Amino acid sequence: ILESTMYQGENYTTSFDELLIKKSQEKGIELHELESVDFQLDLLNNLYTWDDVKATISTVADSTKKEETIKYLKDTFNAYVNGNIEFLEEDVANMKKEVPEFYDALVTQRNIKMAENIDNLVEDGKNHTIAVGCKHFIGEDSILKELEKRGYTINRL
C-alpha cells in the first residue's frame, strides 16, 4: 500500500500487478494466485505492530526518506529491467544479514510455499506464466532454487 502511494506521488497510476491482471483479462487468460491477499495481510499483521506501521508512515511522510525510498524502488526496477542481477542479489543478501527473522518470513518461507504452489499448478501439463516480485527469483532461498530442489531444470533467458 505504501509503495503504491509513493508511486502515485510519482504519477504512476497503475501497479505492475494491476497491469498484468488487466492484460490477462483482456486476453482471456486464466489467473491463479500463488498467495492470497488474506495470506499476505495475515503475514504482515504477524510481523508488524501498529507502532511499526506508524513509524513507516512517518518515514514515508518525511520528504527526504520518501525520495530515498522512491530512488531505491526505481533503482530496483531498473536493475530488474536491465538484468543487473548483482544489484538484486546484494539487496537480498543485505536483507538476510540485517533482518534474518523478517527475511525468513517474507522470503524463505514464502518462496518454499510459492514453489510448492507452482509445482501443483503445472501438474495439469498446460503452459503457465508466473509473476512474482523479482527478488523472489534471486538468491540461495529463491523460488528457482526451491524448484530445482523439486527436480526442475531452470534456464535463465
What do these predicted ranges mean?
Residues 101-157:
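A cross-kingdom marker for long, charged
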